[in-house]
Amino acid sequence: MDAGLNMADRTPPARPRPVEIAAPDTLLLVFSQAPDEDCARRIADALVAERLAACVNITPGMQSVYRWQGEVRRDTEVGLVIKTSASRFAELAGRLKALHPYEVPEIVAVRPDAALPAYVSWAVAQVRKPLV
């Protein structure tokens, strides 16, 4: 009898994972673009100040190629990666749309498959609505 197998189903014991899987509704990464760094900073400052984002990464110099109004366009934009919680996404998306100069801004949210639990806890705490 092999001590490393569960004899009921003959599967090896579960191995510990180096990074804990984040709960599906805890943390969201929201991707957007801004036309320039000043606009990106204004958006980031507002979202963090209003507790809609825990953190916003600003990445200048991104090249975007896309189709808009029947034409293929190429623009240099500033990338935004916004960290928020699933419970704050609707408010964040509405505010981002209001702050954004584009007619149809990119607002795409994804749930990470894995994240450092301490980071998830910190990020979610930053966007939690304060008790009144």
Positions of PLM-derived features:
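Positively charged, small/polar-rich N-terminal and surface patches that mediate targeting and assembly
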Residues: M1-V132
